[in-house]
């Protein structure tokens, strides 16, 4: 997943609703919520960002092996850690690259992080002054700047069922 305000959580909620309507057990691991409760001891260094994703991936693994569909709505900037999670999940990893230009994310930003970064009050914003390594071969690319929410949710839904 890419930048903040790209549409990750909104899409995850749409997919979650469909899964619940099917009677499936489902959990969303949202990056902001996880940072509030599970990884609040971590900062935003490379090592801390990697550890954040590893912890989220481990929780997702535990839930998944117990029959829960897990939707991880997180900024995961580094390819090598995403690859580690793919191995951990052994065939149950489905990467959706929410491809949204930074200017669109900035326009959607309700927390004002992009404005703070632009004003010099915030550093380390993924994709701006901290690197983001796009996936090489994700299972699905969702360009939220050219699709409606409904189209994005439908694309994920169809890909999961193919």
Please place each PLM-identified region on the residue numbering.
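Short, small-residue-biased leader/transition segments that mark boundaries at the very start
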Residues: 1-2
């Amino acid at each position: 997943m890419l930048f903040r305000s790209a549409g990750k959580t909104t899409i995850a909620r749409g997919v979650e609703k469909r899964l619940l309507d099917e009677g499936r057990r489902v959990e969303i691991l949202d990056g902001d919520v996880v940072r509030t409760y599970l990884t609040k001891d971590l900062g935003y260094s490379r090592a801390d960002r990697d550890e954040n994703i590893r912890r989220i991936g481990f929780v997702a693994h535990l839930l998944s092996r117990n029959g829960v569909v897990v939707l991880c709505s997180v900024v995961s900037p580094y390819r090598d850690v995403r690859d580690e999670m793919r191995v951990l999940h052994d065939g149950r990893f489905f990467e959706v690259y929410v491809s949204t230009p930074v200017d669109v994310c900035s326009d959607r930003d309700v927390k004002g992080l992009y404005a703070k970064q632009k004003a010099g009050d915030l550093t380390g914003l993924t994709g701006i002054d901290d690197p983001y390594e796009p996936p090489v071969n994700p299972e699905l690319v969702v360009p939220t700047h050219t699709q409606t929410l409904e189209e994005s949710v439908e694309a994920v839904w169809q890909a999961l069922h193919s």
